[in-house]
Amino acid sequence: MAFPDPFAIDFAYELANQLRTLPVEARIALAEVLEAVAYDPVGSGVRYLATLPEEWRLMFFGDGAGMVAYVVSAKHRRLYVTHITWAG
């Protein structure tokens, strides 16, 4: 379900240094995918694990070289980015 206004995006504190050290192409690809996710947080990506609630999501970016995991809080209209992996 797409929303007219994007959800706010918060990053786990531990990701601050990792975000600064990502290559430029990774940061650009991540920003593009998170913008899309912010407008359609549950419709984007896939469920992180079948054993976790539907709000735990996973999405690939950068032609599959990156992965971002996030939790959707519809109540607070926020996305909480918990993990980023870049193998590019």
Segments predicted by a language model, with ranges:
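Enriched for short, Lys/Arg-rich terminal
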Residues: 1-6, 17, 28, 32, ...
